[in-house]
Amino acid sequence: MFDGTLGTYKGSEYKIELKEGIKPYHAKPFPIPRIHEETLKKEVERLVKIGVLKRINNSEWAAPTFIIPKKNGTVRFISDFRELNKRIKRKPFPIPKIQDLLLKLEGFKYATSLDLNMGYYHIKLCPKSRKLCTIVLP
C-alpha cells in the first residue's frame, strides 16, 4: 500500500495567476549552518529523485529555502514563498461554517480523515507556474 513513492493528482495542472504589472522576486539564499549542509544536500537529492525538484541554471524568480530537523531524524524542507504570495491574484473561496457541514453529515455512519504526506508535492504545476516556484539554495 505504501511503497515510498510520491503519488500525483491526476487532474489538471495548477496555474498560479499573478496580479497585473508585478515584477519578479529573486531572493538571496538563507545561510545554512554547516552542521545541516550534508542533510540539506541529501534532502535536495531525494526530492530531485522523486520528481519534486528539478535543477535549473537560472531564473527571474527564486524563494529562499531551508530545513528544520524533526525529532525523528528527518527534516522538514521549507521554502519562503511570502513574496510570491503577495503577487498572486486571489480567488475568493467561501469556507463553509462548521455547523453547516455537521448538518450535512447527519445520518452518515462513517467519517474519514486523510492526511497527505508531503501534500503540496502531489499537485503538478503548469510550466509557467513552475518558474514562479523556483527556489534558491546556498
Predicted regions: what is each one?
Residues N85-P92, Y120-R130:
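Cytochrome P450 core scaffold surrounding the K-helix E-X-X-R motif
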Residues K71-N85, K97, L101-H122:
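Conserved catalytic palm subdomain of right-hand nucleotidyl-transferase polymerases, strongest
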Residues M1-F93, P138:
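Reverse-transcribing Pol proteins
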Residues C133:
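Conserved P-loop/Walker A NTP-binding site and adjacent catalytic elements of P-loop NTPases
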Residues T5-T8, I67-P69, L101-L105, S113, ...:
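A general structural signal for short secondary-structure junctions and capping/turn motifs
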